[in-house]
Amino acid sequence: MTLKVILGEHQITRTELPVGIATVSGCGAVVYCISKFWGYGAIAPYPQSGGNRVTRALQRAVIDKTKTPIETRFYPLDSLRTVTPKRAVDNGHAVSGAVRDAARRLIDESITAVGGSKFEVNPNPNSSTGLRNHFHFAVGDLAQDFRNDTPADDAFIVGVDVDYYVTEPDVLLEHMRPVVLHTFNPKKVSGFDADSPFTIKNNLVEYKVSGGAAWVHPVWDWCEAGEFIASRVRTSWKEWFLQLPLRMIGLEKVGYHKIHHCRPWTDCPDRALVYTIPQYVIWRFNWIDTELHVRKLKRIEYQDETKPGWNRLEYVTDRNELLVSIGREGEHAQITIEKEKLDMLSGLSATQSVNVRLIGMGHKDPQYTSMIVQYYTGKKVVSPISPTVYKPTMPRVHWPVTSDADVPEVSARQYTLPIVSDCMMMPMIKRWETMSESIERRVTFVANDKKPSDRIAKIAETFVKLMNGPFKDLDPLSIEETIERLNKPSQQLQLRAVFEMIGVEPRQLIESFNKNEPGMKSSRIISGFPDILFILKVSRYTLAYSDIVLHAEHNEHWYYPGRNPTEIADGVCEFVSECDAEVIETDFSNLDGRVSSWMQRNIAQKAMVQAFRPEYRDEIISFMDTIINCSAKAKRFGFRYEPGVGVKSGSSTTTPHNTQYNGCVEFTALTFEHPDAEPEDLFRLIGPKCGDDGLSRAIIQKSINRAAKCFGLELKVERYNPEIGLCFLSRVFVDPLATTTTIQDPLRTLRKLHLTTRDPTIPLADAACDRVEGHLCTDALTPLISDYCKMVLRLYGPTASTEQVRNQRRSRNKEKPYWLTCDGSWPQHPQDAHLMKQVLIKRTAIDEDQVDALIGRFAAMKDVWEKITHDSEESAAACTFDEDGVAPNSVDESLPMLNDAKQTRANPGTSRPHSNGGGSSHGNELPRRTEQRAQGPRQPARLPKQGKTNGKSDGNITAGETQRGGIPRGKGPRGGKTNTRRTPPKAGAQPQPSNNRK
């Protein structure tokens, strides 16, 4: 009834009612949408896009409804470990290279920390895994195959020094993934990027790397103000076809990124770490202006439009100062001035006014004021084009953890790049910290005062008796015979200088120095006796004993010093055959430093005392006293130190005595294994020994370590493996059962073959040719090693001096292999070439394809400085800083001790931190036997009495007065006073207790 009243006479049907409702709802919705859309066209309270309200509303609506946030949490500086990375090897750009390496590590670690994967653009050969975009544009790119992968969904786009060459940043940003770049973005218009010079010309950076390449490139303004940038969004082919209708009406897909940058590297302030974080993806009309404000990445224009020929760059310092760097295009001269000062100076009317104002501001440097005036006048000059000789590559440097050095200082040169990346390091022998750390690690920390048990002492006594055999009344060599045997040029020169003084008691002093040789840990110490009279005195006995006793028939099966390479090879092969290849290699750890005074007294000294006539015993004991207890000083630096009781490497007793200790340890192990056997039978089972190298029967593999510990020694044992050969005296026997062919220990050789320690005045080509010629004599058939040597000889030969000139140098054979001086070379047979190659592959862990590639590379090389380095998987460096920071196990509880010792030697007046006299004695025997030495060692009647000493340990200085002639203490060789800091305290002074070490 009510409806009828409202609608009149017309009555609606049931069908018409829903239609009416729908019509009304639709109209309402349309009105709502129109009002909502019209609301997008509202006038904002800030600047807005042009066009009419309809287009403005249309653009705003599309952006608002299609925006898709992208959430990525990434902060790479959480993985920053150091701001001053170091490189142990100076390849000409060690600092900038270390920064690049650190940046790569930082990027890798930060990506891994958030669970992402890396997608790198043209990575270097060190980065060989993962997805990548790798095109061949530089020669170095050929090291990896061409690839054009698609980034994964969790990928981080990485570029290290490659963004300059990108045609447009969108190729990196379009994937809508974080982008991380290590880039060069200078804050000055010329100068040095750490150790690499650069200039800017025509808005292009000309960057020249010492020991590397030269690069010319523009720079993107990643570090400009403005934190948001836009990019296109990459789509697949399928998406592109599906979105084609949208594109036809002018819609495009756009991504927005937030850009960050930092400069974390203290040594390279012009290097920046740039990373972008994607924020949103939207659709928008490309024919309607957008109101989203972003900056557009562009190339930096360094040219000053107001001063043709000049570059100008402004930057803000950490102290919020706005500075300006100005300099002429292509020139290295540049100056930096505060922006407000330059603005003021630019408005002056005369150059004189500019000079006056600069001086008034406190700028009195002529170079500084001249550059400002030249910029003021806009003076242009024509830059000369001249070749530049850049800093050569430097050897890898062993950098002790306690060193205070700012730059590496080594006395060695490279004549090619390293063959393997984990090459040996050269010690900084000119740094006293190097000497100090070597003393601690090779003397103090390993000092041994172990006294063996009665059973072990009895075994050692039996060994000495069997070693001496029937000899009991030997005579030493005469002075004349000994002089003839000491035939090294340096020895002959010293002997001629003291010929008239023969018979005078020699000085009791060791002068030590670091051996200038490549290695993987703290360098070895050569403890030399500077007085040739002492060497003459000792050699009379050691030479006679070796000739008659050690080379006697009953010792020839195990005593190998004095044999030539062919004899050694034959003996080793015979021993291995006798044992059916069941043999082990033995290698002592720091035998020189660990030999105890007990071993020296009861093995080496006892053997000679019992072998020579009784009238010579006092003289033998005298020189053994000196060897064991002699004081020492650093030859280069002058500080004195406790050398310990170990074997002194500069003594003529070193090799024969070490060989005897080596043999005694094996004899002890054999006795453990066969306690009921006759000693004579066990003695005949001792394997080849030479110094601290040895071969033994595998039956004592377990007991020989026990035997070594009984004497306080440490020993490494390795069982013979036919796949890797048998190593003895740094020669690898490839198959001792079938052939005498040997090769140099390949990994050890490859690590140091590129280095020379010859005098730097000798041309590098001469030094290189001399060195590789020696290796070609001993290893003419060794694969890879001989190929490398032939390459060096081929490329350096044309520029090297003539054979006659090189032969006239006394140091010609300095770096020749030792065995070339021993009447022969090691045997090698052509039919064993394949076997040699397989052993080399196993020992170096370089697969056969890579070995063949290196050999082919050596044969094709045109320049010695071409890149040849094979990347090693692991580093064997120890006690140093390597390219990745501190080498494993280099910093431990010994660090405070090393620092204490270094500080003590830097300040000789302070107390020695080693209360036990360097660790040479902790038990029953007094350090350095001062009480016995105060009375003077026993002397033979026919020699002048040895001078008396009153030696007492005082810190790191041994004070004492002697009756022998020589330079008085406190006086230099010319009568002048020496450094008072090195003057020892008076005899009898008491050492001060140390609070640092016990």
UniProtKB/Swiss-Prot annotation:
Residue stretches in coiled coil: none
InterPro entries to which the protein is assigned, alphabetical: DNA/RNA_pol_sf, Noda_Vmethyltr_dom
Single GO molecular function: RNA-directed RNA polymerase activity
Region of interest: Capping: 91-282
Cofactors demanded by this protein: Mn(2+)
Cofactor annotation comment: For RdRP activity.
GO cellular component: host cell mitochondrial outer membrane; membrane
Topology in membrane: Single-pass membrane protein
Reactions this protein catalyses: RNA(n) + a ribonucleoside 5'-triphosphate = RNA(n+1) + diphosphate
Sequence intervals crossing the membrane: 17-34
Any Pfam family the entry gives: Noda_Vmethyltr
Major localization listed first in the record, in broad terms: host cell
Subcellular location: Host mitochondrion outer membrane
Catalytic residues of the enzyme: D692
Keyword Thylakoid found: no
Keyword Cytoplasm: no
Domain notes: The N-terminus is important for both membrane association and mitochondrial localization. It may also contain a RNA methyltransferase (MTase-GTase) capping domain. The C-terminus contains the RNA-dependent RNA polymerase domain and a structurally disordered region at the very end.
Quaternary structure annotation from Swiss-Prot or TrEMBL: Homododecamer. Forms 2 stacked rings of 35-nm in diameter, arranged in a crown-like structure at the opening of virus-induced replication vesicles. Interacts with protein B2.
Protein known as: RNA-directed RNA polymerase
Species: Black beetle virus (BBV)
Organism taxonomic ancestry: Viruses, Riboviria, Orthornavirae, Kitrinoviricota, Magsaviricetes
